Amino acid sequence: MGSQSLNSTFLKVRRLSLISSNERLLGQTSGLATGSRLVTQEVDDLRVIPGSRPDLDDHQPQCSLAELPSTAHGKRKPGHLPRLRSSAVKGHAPDPNPSLSIVSKRIFKGESVIKGPEDRQTFVGPSGLPKISPKATAGEAQGKKRTMELLNKARKQEEKVSNLLDIRQLPKQEVFINNTHPCKKHLKQQPMSLEEWRRGHLGGDNTGLISQEPFRCCKRLGKKAQCQLLEVTSLEAEASLEVLKRRRRMQAMEMSKKPQDRGLGQEKAVFLSREKVKPSSHDMHLSTAERSFKPKSMPKAEDWDLSVQGTPVVLTVRDHSNVSQAQKHLGCAEIFHSRDGRCTLLKRGGA
């Protein structure tokens, strides 16, 4: 009897420890899911302890944890719970680690909560592996998929917002540094080199390149870099103008060496260079010597108007035989040829 009383007290202590552990688990689950009345009702059922147990024979019907009324789901299902049999009759202590715990699980799908008897997990056996229903696994998969979709959507929205902020920070128009004609440069356009800018400045269509805004330097360059760039461009521009003037002067001098095109060549050279050409003293000496040997120009012939002056006179060789015969017969001394080609005979006064 002493051993049986010890075994009964041991079982009571063990039952109380199991109840306290279940209460801790239920406190954790109730913090995540509100209104878990079903789980608390199961714990109340577990707390029911028989008033007196005089003996633990196999002949007397035993009231174990599995035989307690299960009012959690409205029906009693003793077949779903394993029976815990005492081993005090066999003469050895009971199993100190009985693996029996009933946890009612609530599955979250987004904002809705699904609960039911099929969602309950029962941990049975020494390994303690859970037996999860297929509906519970499908719900967990859908919940994970939903969370991943929400995370991806939030990440995309953050990227869009960052891109919009970057675009707003960029300036609307950037001005390319140029001391004579500042021009607009598009955001996606590559910077123009100095050689390309000079080629476009000397020849080409410059419409639409002059900006209407006041001139300003780019913010990317420092003060020292800006000064150096302006000095270099100004010196190179002056050098290019000097080379161009020198070439035009050489062309003008070559044109002036030809006597027939001297005057025309000088005019062309002056027109091209837009400034007076100053030839050297040697060229001036040669030009004066050539002018002395230049032949005088012939007077320009006037145009003959037939309506006013008539047909021009054609001079032919006089036929003396015909004239002598006319003088003999008519006795005229002189023949006057008019402009019309008619011949008139003039008689002498004494004849």
Curated annotation (Swiss-Prot):
GO cellular component: nucleus
Stretch list, region Disordered: 69-101, 117-144, 275-298
Tissue-level expression: Specific to testis, where it is expressed in spermatogonia.
Chief localisation class: nucleus
Bias (Basic residues) ranges: 73-83
Compartments, as annotated in UniProt: Nucleus
Keywords for this protein: Nucleus
Domain of life: Eukaryota
Keyword Zinc-finger appears in the UniProt entry: no
Compositional bias (Basic and acidic residues): 275-285
Function (record text): Nuclear factor which might have a role in spermatogenesis.
Name used for this protein in its record: Protein Tex24
Source organism (scientific name): Mus musculus
Record gene name: Tex24
